[in-house]
C-alpha cells in the first residue's frame, strides 16, 4: 500500500513554490554557461559507431579499450509503435522562418529585467543582451514552446530572427532551449545559423539569430518538379559542409528536414533549429527515438534503436538530396511507422541479418510484419537521379538501412558527384561562404530545369538512346 501524503498548509505550499521558482531561475542561468564548458571538457570521452569514411578523430567503438568505452544505454519498453497508428504526417514549415522548435511549455508575461549578456555602452544607448535592444516587426510563427518574430536591432539596424521561448513558471528554462543555446554559442560556420545574442528575463529566454528569409521547404514549394541540378549540388555541398563541421565536434543535429535548412537571398544554406541536437560526449540516459520528422527518420530509429551516431543525420541528407532532385519526398509515409518502413523497404529491400547484421535485435523488428521486398536501383524509384552524373551512386551510399554503411559527411564531400566544382571550395575557411569563389552562383529555376538538364547532359542522352 502506498503511503498517503498529508495535506500541507496553503502558506507553506506557497513558500515551497516560491523557493522552487527561485532555484529554477538560478539553475537555468548557471546551466547556460556550464553546459558549454562541460561540452568542451568532455569531448575526449566520446565513443561512436562509425559511418563509412568518418574522420579518424571519431574512432570506431572497437578501437577503444573496454575500460574506456562510454556507451549509450538502450532502453526497451513495452511500447509498440505498430499497434497504435500516429496521425497522418504532413510536411509543414513555419511561416517565413524555419528556425523554430515547437515543444510543450506554458505561456508567460514579458519582463524587462535582464539576466545575461549585457555589453558595455553608454547609459542611454541600446545594448546587446537587453530586451529593448530589438524591435519586433512581425510574427513569423508560433508554437506551444516558442514564438518567432522578424525583428530589427536598435544597435546596428540589422534584421534578426527573435526566438522567444516562454519559461514554465515552476520548471524554468526548457532543456531543449538550453541545449540549443549552449551548442550554438560555440558554432561559428557559414553554413550554420548564427546566434547573435541571448536575452534571459524572468518569463522568457530570447535567442537572437541572424535573419534568413526562407527555408528549403519553401524554396522547393516555390519551384516544384525538382530543382536545377547545379543548385541541388550547391545546396547539398553546403549542407554536408555544415554537417561535417558539427560532426567533427561530436554534435548530432538529429532533426534534419527541409524546414530546418534556411536559404538566404544569395543562396547560402544554413543549418538551423538545434533544439534536438545532442553533444555525443555529454552523458544522458538514452537518446529518444522520437526525433526527426517521420519522412526523414532512418529505419534503425524507426525500429526502436537508441544507439546512434552521426550516421543518423546522413540518412536525412540522402532523403533531402533525392527530394531536391525528384521534386517529391523520398519516403512520404502517410499512415504510421509501419507504412514508413514499408516505403523504405519497397526501394531498398526488406533487411535481414545478412544485409543488416543486428537488425533482428532491434526492439520493433518483427519479420512477419513486413512484406518481403528485394532491393532495386534507385533510378527505378526516382528516375531523375539518372539525369545527373554520379547522383544515383551518392544517394545509394547515403540511403543505407544499416547505419554503419552510410557515408559520412566528410567522405560525401569527396564523392565524384562534386568533381566538377571549383577546387577552391574545399580550401575555404569555416566562416567563408562558397559564393566568395568566382563563378559559383545559383542558376535560375524553372519548372522543367531538371528535365531539360537530363535531355542535354551526356548521361541523359546515353540513357535516352539506350531506350531506342
From Swiss-Prot:
<dbReference type="GO" id="GO:0005829">
    <property type="term" value="C:cytosol"/>
</dbReference>
<dbReference type="InterPro" id="IPR050108">
    <property type="entry name" value="CDK"/>
</dbReference>
<keyword id="KW-0723">Serine/threonine-protein kinase</keyword>
<dbReference type="GO" id="GO:0051301">
    <property type="term" value="P:cell division"/>
</dbReference>
<feature type="modified residue" description="Phosphoserine">
    <location>
        <position position="94"/>
    </location>
</feature>
<feature type="region of interest" description="Disordered">
    <location>
        <begin position="448"/>
        <end position="468"/>
    </location>
</feature>
<dbReference type="Pfam" id="PF00069">
    <property type="entry name" value="Pkinase"/>
</dbReference>
<dbReference type="GO" id="GO:0005886">
    <property type="term" value="C:plasma membrane"/>
</dbReference>
<dbReference type="GO" id="GO:0000086">
    <property type="term" value="P:G2/M transition of mitotic cell cycle"/>
</dbReference>
<dbReference type="GO" id="GO:0000308">
    <property type="term" value="C:cytoplasmic cyclin-dependent protein kinase holoenzyme complex"/>
</dbReference>
<dbReference type="GO" id="GO:0060828">
    <property type="term" value="P:regulation of canonical Wnt signaling pathway"/>
</dbReference>
<comment type="function">
    <text>Serine/threonine-protein kinase involved in the control of the eukaryotic cell cycle, whose activity is controlled by an associated cyclin. Acts as a cell-cycle regulator of Wnt signaling pathway during G2/M phase by mediating the phosphorylation of LRP6 at 'Ser-1490', leading to the activation of the Wnt signaling pathway. Acts as a regulator of cell cycle progression and cell proliferation via its interaction with CCDN3. Phosphorylates RB1 in vitro, however the relevance of such result remains to be confirmed in vivo.</text>
</comment>
<feature type="region of interest" description="Disordered">
    <location>
        <begin position="102"/>
        <end position="131"/>
    </location>
</feature>
<dbReference type="GO" id="GO:0016055">
    <property type="term" value="P:Wnt signaling pathway"/>
</dbReference>
<feature type="modified residue" description="Phosphoserine">
    <location>
        <position position="77"/>
    </location>
</feature>
<comment type="similarity">
    <text>Belongs to the protein kinase superfamily. CMGC Ser/Thr protein kinase family. CDC2/CDKX subfamily.</text>
</comment>
<feature type="active site" description="Proton acceptor">
    <location>
        <position position="255"/>
    </location>
</feature>
<dbReference type="GO" id="GO:0005524">
    <property type="term" value="F:ATP binding"/>
</dbReference>
<dbReference type="InterPro" id="IPR017441">
    <property type="entry name" value="Protein_kinase_ATP_BS"/>
</dbReference>
<keyword id="KW-1003">Cell membrane</keyword>
<keyword id="KW-0418">Kinase</keyword>
<keyword id="KW-0067">ATP-binding</keyword>
<keyword id="KW-0472">Membrane</keyword>
<keyword id="KW-0808">Transferase</keyword>
<dbReference type="GO" id="GO:0005634">
    <property type="term" value="C:nucleus"/>
</dbReference>
<protein>
    <recommendedName>
        <fullName>Cyclin-dependent kinase 14</fullName>
        <ecNumber>2.7.11.22</ecNumber>
    </recommendedName>
</protein>
<feature type="domain" description="Protein kinase">
    <location>
        <begin position="134"/>
        <end position="418"/>
    </location>
</feature>
<keyword id="KW-0539">Nucleus</keyword>
<keyword id="KW-0131">Cell cycle</keyword>
<dbReference type="GO" id="GO:0030332">
    <property type="term" value="F:cyclin binding"/>
</dbReference>
<feature type="binding site">
    <location>
        <position position="163"/>
    </location>
    <ligand>
        <name>ATP</name>
    </ligand>
</feature>
<feature type="compositionally biased region" description="Polar residues">
    <location>
        <begin position="455"/>
        <end position="468"/>
    </location>
</feature>
<keyword id="KW-0879">Wnt signaling pathway</keyword>
<dbReference type="GO" id="GO:0004693">
    <property type="term" value="F:cyclin-dependent protein serine/threonine kinase activity"/>
</dbReference>
<keyword id="KW-0597">Phosphoprotein</keyword>
<dbReference type="GO" id="GO:0106310">
    <property type="term" value="F:protein serine kinase activity"/>
</dbReference>
<dbReference type="InterPro" id="IPR008271">
    <property type="entry name" value="Ser/Thr_kinase_AS"/>
</dbReference>
<dbReference type="InterPro" id="IPR011009">
    <property type="entry name" value="Kinase-like_dom_sf"/>
</dbReference>
<comment type="subunit">
    <text>Found in a complex with LRP6, CCNY and CAPRIN2 during G2/M stage; CAPRIN2 functions as a scaffold for the complex by binding to CCNY via its N terminus and to CDK14 via its C terminus. Interacts with CCNY; CCNY mediates its recruitment to the plasma membrane and promotes phosphorylation of LRP6. Interacts with CCDN3 and CDKN1A. Interacts with SEPT8. Interacts with 14-3-3 proteina YWHAB, YWHAE, YWHAH and YWHAQ.</text>
</comment>
<keyword id="KW-0132">Cell division</keyword>
<keyword id="KW-0963">Cytoplasm</keyword>
<feature type="binding site">
    <location>
        <begin position="140"/>
        <end position="148"/>
    </location>
    <ligand>
        <name>ATP</name>
    </ligand>
</feature>
